[in-house]
Amino acid sequence: MAFQVKIHQIRAFVEVARQGSIRGASRMLNMSQPAQSKSIQELEEGLAAQLFFRRSKGVTLTDAGESFYQHASLILEELRAAQEDIRQRQGQLAGQINIGMGPVFPAV
């Protein structure tokens, strides 16, 4: 049977690529570093390709990693759009709200 890429592996891969480190990605995804490393290792083994060059100061994408990153980013964006579409169809609020706040001065 062919290797099945799991969505959590795609999320882990994309975040590691964005952060440039497994440690940074682990923090962003609230995941332990060993779990993050295992997810990436399983993905690389399943794809039979090295996706990252591992260095003491982080990771960088290999050529295969660059290619997979382009596809993986699109997959995550499409998944987000599909989830938002379903929420809208169900009458739920969807989207993102940004709230800004100016300086706060204490009462005198």
How would you name each of these model-derived features?
Residues 9-16, 68:
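Short alpha-helical "packing" element that flanks the helix-turn-helix/winged-helix DNA-binding module
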